Amino acid sequence: MADPSQASFWAQANALLRKNLTYQRRHIWTNIRLVLVPLLLCLFLLGIQLLLDVVVNKAADLTKCGSQDDFSIGDCPIPNPPLLPPLLQIPEPESRAVSGGFFSYNDLPDKSCRKTGTCPVTILLTGNNHSLGQALSGNMFGGSFAVNSSDLLSSLAYNVLGSTLALGTNNYADPGIESDFPIYSIQSQCSPNSTWPLSFGKIHTAVTCLQGLSLWRNNSVEVNDELFKGNWKGNPERMTNEIAAAYDLLNTDRNNFDVTIWYNSTNIDDPSRAPLVRVPRLLNLVSNAYLKFLKGPGTRILFEFVKEVPKHQTKFNLDIASMLGPLFFTWVVLLLFPVILTSLVYEKQERLRIIMKMHGLGIGPYWMISYAYFLTLSMFYVISLVIFGSAIGLRYFRLNDYSVQFIFYFIFVNLQISFAFLASSIFSKVKTATVVAYTLVFASGLLGMFLFGELLESPTFPEKGILALELYPGFSLFRGLYEFAQYASRGNGMKWKDLKESGMDKLFYLMSVEWFVILIVAYSIDLLSSSGRSPFVFFKKSSSLPSPSVQRQNSENVLIDMEKTDVTQEREKVEKLRKEGTTGHAIVCDNLKKVYPGSDGNPPKLAVRGLYLDVPSGECFGMLGPNGAGKTSFINMMTGLLKPTSGTALVQGLDICKDMNKVYTSMGVCPQHDLLWGTLTGREHLLFYGRLKNIKGSALMQAVEESLKSVSLFDGGVADKPAGKYSGGMKRRLSVAISLIGNPKVVYMDEPSTGLDPASRKDLWTVIQRAKQNTAIILTTHSMEEAEFLCDRLGIFVDGGLQCVGNPKELKGRYGGSYVFTMTTSVEHEEKVERMVKHISPNSKRVYHLAGTQKFEIPKQEVMIADVFFMVEKVKSKFTVFAWGLADTTLEDVFFKVATTAQAFNSLS
């Protein structure tokens, strides 16, 4: 096998990219189905649109066309639109300008007129010539109302008529004439009960006199101030004081007519419908006043009527995509969020991210490749949505500028991906992440439609509040889709010039800034998590670990005093190596300690108590210990998952606290549970991890082939079968092969032969024995047979401390200086058996007895094996012996003895 070296950023990225491409190729139909989701949803919308068109066309009653109601039927042809008298737009009676409060002008009427509904309508004038303004002011309104029924439109043109009702989107009908609301005749003075009947074709209504005031202001600043304060948003009392119109005569004189008109356009309820505004009559009014000033009262321009252009018969067109687009397409685009989030959480839940990190994959290449994949998938998805929607003729997509749509979707999908990376730091289970993600998707659409959409249309909700709500990506998406729908319904769609008017420019800026901020925060949190620190470390109260109690300090002093000779020698060897250098020593642990902070009133947990350990290259060191002894914490520190509380360890001379990324290049890990991709083959797994070890070209192929052969996964096409179809034993062998690919200098194996049959276990042990020739291996196991077969030295861990170190024979000789004698008889003969054992070995100790079966430890120096056989024959002559046995001390006995002794001592201390 080729020796590994540190893979560069691009080598790691290349390895992950190749693995991901292979993985996605195996899931090609899943990806195709995902990209086709927009097509299916667009077809669904098209089906609803076609069905709705059929229903509406059947329901449309075109038989009334040509009747008296034909102008109110939008589908009817109108070859001869009606002639309508032009009206002024005047404020409602309760909103007309009055004096008092925030208005400092005394020429306005008293606010008591609002109680009787008699407040006049006010028009403001300003300019550079006050006397001219006063003259024009007197010429604005007539003094009486008179009509000639034989020439109604011409006679009405001599009067100044107005209405409080706004126009619609066309001039086929005027609500001010056809409704039950009064038409006003604006005059300089009104007599009491001045009302006149008026018949306009088949419409019968009444005209009511309304006083008109023309008031002078010194300059346009005063006019602007008065108009602004007259709007309810412009004054602290939230009161409406509406001026009908205002004129700035500028430099107007007898030789020059130059005027600017202020008019009210804030009564537009639905901007998408683009209603007409009654401006022409305002212009005619001031023009006639100027002509009277120049030529006398008999001179005027008669503005007799307004008339819409003729139209053909049209069909009622209800654009369902524009109506439901914001809700529907919010759901469609947000469906990517659960896909991205669950993919990220899955790698965390299955610990695939961790195992890749342990084999040398840095956080930078992982983020770059993963982000690029999600971005590519997202852009394919939204581009498919736009293409499919345009292809089937949805105006929602066809009318809005494609470049505007592209930029909007590009910014949003980047924001969504960043948000998914951030959210993935919260979840550890795919099911939880899936439920929360889909809940957010549907809640975002519904809240966007029925809450956020209402706030967008509300004139009272502040813009800052809208921007604050748009900080949530779901609402920012809804806002953009809402604006697309509004502009598409107008018939012209959104262009780049419309960004400022619609507020999309601010939305683009907000999403872009939020994208980068969330991306940086998510990356920082992931960086902290990968270093073994809590991602929420900044939100925790800063505090140092509490110092141990006096009792705990005394206990540790006693432990040092009671330290076994072999453990002391190991510590002294490490201290000497640190002084002289560690050349040739693969692993050197120097006072490595891990303390978990206490919580809920509990004291800190000392998981690893100042470990000293030297493992040279070519040695397999076995770690034995009961559950909770600290083995996992030790391995996690050595593999970079946890930061040591104090002390350190050197791996090939590299400090795990400072150079962990370099350590990964020479490290292999075989975890307790197989961390594999079910759809990747054994060969593809090894190719990926080989590339992470910076093995290239033919050397990579050779290393993969040798690894597969060494664990019996090469022949019979097994190497090219998906790992998901492997048996448990085959997966275990593949995990061992992964840990050994690239000839790493240090390998950590956690119960490598778990789940294997005896034959496979022996083969695997042979592989590990061959691998350790140039490698330092630390192996944890509960199998004493495995430890005795593989390990050159063993260490027994109890309560975070190393209790003994040595090769298996030394430990059995040191802690097992006795034979184990077992005999099974009837219960009534138990005492006789015990007396006979005591007879040949006074210092023997019974360690077990149950239902006639007894086990004794007999010191070797007190008895010969022949004495035991002689005693058994003597016993058999006196009563029945069902079974008996004599055995030397096993490694399991040593482990049990050391562990129970240490635990008993620690509990007493």
Curated annotation (Swiss-Prot):
Residues annotated as domain ABC transporter: 587-824
Keyword Nuclease listed: no
Modified residues (Phosphoserine): 555
Subcellular location: Membrane
GO cellular component: membrane
Presence of the UniProt keyword Metal-binding in the record: no
Family: Belongs to the ABC transporter superfamily. ABCA family. CPR flippase (TC 3.A.1.211) subfamily.
Descriptive protein name: ABC transporter A family member 10
Organism: Arabidopsis thaliana
Gene that encodes the chain: ABCA10
